[in-house]
Amino acid sequence: MRITRREFAMMTGAAVLAPSLPVRAESANIFVPGFNLPANLDPHQVLDVSETDYALNTYDHLYRWEDNPAKMRPWLAVSYTASSDGLTWDFKLRHGVKFHDGSELTAADVVYSVQRLLGLNKAPSAPFQTVLRPDSVSAPEPDLVRFKLAQPFGPFFSTIPMIAVVNPRIVKAQEKDGDWAATWLASNEAGSGAYRLIASSYVPLERAELERSADHFMGWKDNPRPIAKIDWRPAQVTSTRVLALLNGSLDMTDSNLPVDQVERIQKAPNAHIAKNPTMRLLLIRMNNTKPPFDNINARKCFAHAFNYDGFINEIVKGYATRNAAPLPNNIWGYPKDEKGYDYDLTKAKEYFDKAVAEGAPIKRPIELHVQQPLEQTVQAGQLFQSDLATVGVNLKLVSDTFANLTSVSSKPDTTPDMWIHWVSTYYVDPDNWIGQMYDSRFHGTWKASCWYTNPKVDALLRKARSLVEQEDRAPLYEEVARMIVADSPDIWIYNHIEVVGIANRVQGFRHCPVGSGGEVRWMHLTA
C-alpha cells in the first residue's frame, strides 16, 4: 500500500532514548553541544564530521580551513614553499607552541604524527597513502617540516589540515605491541589545541568534557570572553536534542535537523537557526559487488525510483539543492550540463524488467541501512521504500549506526546491499568526493563502499590527482563525473544547506564546511 505525501511527512523514525541532559546553570561559562561524539577520539583513526569537530578543538594542524567559503589559514605553520615540480613542500613552524603537557611542539613531532597516520593506515590516511612514505617526511631543522612526494599530488596542500599533530612523548609511552597507542588514544588526548580533554569525564559516545587551554599559542585576543568549558553530551534522538535546546539545557544541535524540528526552533524565543550553504552530499550507496547491483539495469531502476524533488521540496523543505553527480555542484570540476537521473517510475519499471530478464535477483528482499539517530535518513528510506514497492522491489529498512556501517563496509561481503549517508568536506578539493569515492584504490574505506570498479575512471582520477593546476584538473573531473553517472553506481540526492539550532546566548558561531562550525574557540556566551 502506498502512503500519501501528507502521511509520509508525519512519519518519524523510532529511536532509542538518549541519556538525560542536565539543566544548565545559565550563569556558568559552559558550552553544551548536542552533536555526536566520534566513535573514538583518535584523529588518526576516524574520519567523520564528529571527529573533525573534536580534533578542531583539541588538536592543531599546520594549516586550517576557516569560514565559508572555506579559506586556508596558517596555523602551526607560518608559511610554506613548494618546488616547481610539486614534489617538495617545506612548512616553516611558528615558535613557542606547547602541547597540553607543557612540552614544546617541534618539526620532529609533526614528522612523528605523519608517520603514525600512515602507519595506522585508517581512513584519515587515505589521501596520502599513494604519495607519502614514512621516510619521505623529515625535519631538517627544529622549525622546518619537509614533505617529499612520490609523485605530484594536486590536492596535497588542501589535505594538510587533515594532519592532526599529536605529542609523541605522551603517545609512545602508551604503546603496546607496536600499536601506535591506538587503543589508548581512542579514549584519551595528546594534543595542543585550544581545549584539552578531561580524560576522567569521557564516556564513549555519551559524554566528554573539555577545558580551555589558556596558554594556547593563538591566544585569545580575538575572543575576550572565551568559553571556559565544553560539556559534550550528545542525545541520540533528534527531538530530544531540540527539546533540550528549547528548555535551556543544550546550546547547539547537530546540522541534520528535519524540517519539523527546524520550525520548532524558529518559533522559540531563546534559540535560532543558523543556515549556511555547504559542500555535503547525501547519497544512497549500492554494493556493486552484490547481485542485483552488479547489473547496471538494476542500478538504473533504483536511480529512477527515488523522488529527488519530492524529498528536497516536501521533506527537506528546500534546505538542499539537487546534486546529480558525485561531487558538489558548487565546486570546480562539477559538470554543469549533467542532469543525472530523474524520478520516473515508468523508466524504473522498464529497467526492473530488463534486470529480471537478465537474471538479476532484483525481486529478492533488498536491505537499505539507515542511521536511526538521523531522522532524515529514515525519512529518505521510507519514501524510497514506498515508491520502489510500486515497481516491484521489496525494500527493507534496517536501523544501524554510522560507526558500525563504516566498520562493516571495509569488506564487500559485509557491506550492506545499500546504505545512506552524507559525504562531508574534509578537504576542499574534488578529490575529497569523487576521487575518494570511485577510485578502486580506496576500496575498503567507507567513502568507497559501493565497490565500484572502472579502469578508465581509475586512470582519469589518478591523472587528475597527479596534476597541480586547477585549470588542467577541472576538465578531467567533469569528464570522469559524466562517466560515473552513466554507470550509476550510487544514487546522488542533494547538496546540503546546513541548519543548526543555536541558543541565543551563544555568540561568535563561525560556519565552515570543514567541521560544520564546530570550532568553539571563536564562541562566547552572553549568560
Language-model-derived ranges and their functions:
Residues 33-84, 115, 190-192:
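N-terminal lobe/hinge region of extracytoplasmic solute-binding protein
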Residues 500-527:
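Long beta-strand-rich cores associated with HINT superfamily self-processing modules
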Residues 198, 206-216, 294-386, 390-391, ...:
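Append "and occasionally in soluble cytosolic enzymes with long acidic Gly/Pro-rich linkers
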Residues 183, 216-263, 394:
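Ligand-site clamp/hinge motif
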Residues 66-68, 163-225, 229-231, 346, ...:
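Gly/Pro-rich hinge or "lid" segments in bacterial periplasmic/extracellular proteins
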Residues 204-206, 237, 354-425, 449, ...:
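Ligand/substrate-recognition segments at binding pockets and active sites
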Residues 92, 127-174, 196, 201:
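Surface-exposed binding/hinge segments that line
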Residues 394-406, 435-504, 527:
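Extracytoplasmic/peripheral linker and loop segments enriched in polar/acidic and small residues
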